[in-house]
Amino acid sequence: MKILPINTKSKNYKIYIGHNIIDKFNFIIKKERINFKKSLLIVDKNISKNFIKKINSKINCEKKITFLFNSSERNKNLTYINTILEILFKNNFARNDMIICLGGGI
């Protein structure tokens, strides 16, 4: 697992990157004392539905949203970024809410 530290003027935080990281999800949440009310799971449609269910079962929050998309070079564009931003805005995501991205090419 790779930990990428992010340092800003207002807050420092970490981005966790790695294989099978979902098995460490609850450990990371407790270790970092992360509190969030909403989660957005951005998933490549090639990811199995059972794996998506497994991930959602690990996430404990008030509102869970899953956004599926086709992993294709055509879809790596501002339209998809705007779609994701619209989901965040329409659901009143805050800075302390969770975004999880899974799959190749996201």
Where do the model's predicted regions map?
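ATP/NTP phosphate-donor binding region
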Residues: 1-99
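A phosphate-binding catalytic loop at a beta-strand-loop-alpha-helix junction
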Residues: 98-106
